[in-house]
């Protein structure tokens, strides 16, 4: 994907910068912020090596855009799900009210970051070297990629239609994750090891404490 971005941007540093920030903002609307950054940072490092530039401005911009993009949809950030659940908002309700503002804010911030980083965004890849960039060659398992994209598309469609389905967004996401585990035939030890258990325990403890404070009336005071 990193090589494809360079290719589409014709090797221009500024275009790569804008495309990557827009990608992270969009990805964060459907993935949580941490996942979007974990996906984008390795790409940024590879792009920086290819283009012989510093990855710092790009990574900082991605962190900012991931937070803005995450506010656009119900599934973009864990607090969004909590807020929507308490307010009785569906996926589409949240999208209609939040996405327009998030889109405007994203492009405004991208413009500001381009201006602030204008000295670092000069130059790019030599046109003669673009022919050596083969994005398709970097894919090691195309059948699995295609299956994963199909599952992702179905999950996103279910999120949009969940108001008419007897399923909560969390259940839809869990079904999608389970389907990918079965399709990829990933051993239990491997995917269980990759789960951020510490983060889950942290949020569980945080919600328990907040719930206790609400029940005893501490927050009302």
Task: Go through each PLM region and give its residues.
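Membrane-embedded alpha-helical segments and adjacent helix-loop junctions characteristic
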Residues: 1-55, 197-221
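Transmembrane helix-loop junctions in multipass membrane proteins, especially transporters and channels
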Residues: 11, 37, 89, 114-126, ...
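Juxtamembrane and boundary regions of transmembrane helices in multi-pass small-molecule transporters
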Residues: 11, 50-56, 60, 72-75, ...
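Helix-loop-helix module between adjacent transmembrane segments
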Residues: 11-12, 20-33, 65-73, 100-109
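Hydrophobic alpha-helical transmembrane segments
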Residues: 14-22, 36, 59-60, 95, ...
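Transmembrane helical segments that form the transport core of multi-pass membrane transport proteins
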Residues: 20, 151-221
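Re-entrant/interfacial helical elements at transmembrane boundaries that shape
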Residues: 35-46, 59-60, 73-87, 127-128, ...
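Alpha-helical transmembrane segments of multipass membrane proteins
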Residues: 69, 105-109, 113, 155-158, ...
């Amino acid at each position: 994907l990193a090589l494809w971005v360079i290719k589409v941007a014709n090797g221009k540093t500024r275009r790569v910068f804008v495309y990557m920030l827009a990608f992270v903002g969009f990805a964060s609307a459907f993935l949580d912020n941490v996942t979007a950054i974990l996906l984008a940072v390795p790409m940024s490092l590879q792009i920086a090596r290819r283009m012989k530039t510093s990855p710092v401005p790009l990574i900082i911009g991605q962190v900012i855009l991931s937070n803005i993009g995450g506010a656009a949809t119900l599934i973009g950030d864990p607090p969004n799900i909590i807020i929507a659940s308490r307010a009785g908002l569906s996926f589409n309700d949240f999208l209609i009210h939040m996405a327009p503002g998030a889109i405007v804010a994203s492009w405004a911030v991208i413009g500001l970051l381009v201006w602030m980083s204008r000295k670092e965004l000069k130059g790019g890849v030599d046109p003669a070297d673009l022919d050596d960039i083969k994005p398709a060659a970097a894919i090691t398992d195309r059948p699995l990629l295609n299956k994963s994209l199909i599952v992702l598309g179905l999950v996103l469609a279910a999120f949009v239609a969940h108001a008419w389905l007897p399923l909560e967004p969390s259940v839809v996401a869990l079904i999608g994750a389970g389907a990918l585990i079965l399709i990829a035939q990933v051993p239990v030890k491997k995917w269980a090891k990759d789960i951020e258990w510490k983060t889950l325990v942290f949020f569980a403890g945080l919600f328990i404490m907040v719930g206790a404070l609400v029940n005893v009336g501490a927050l009302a005071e």
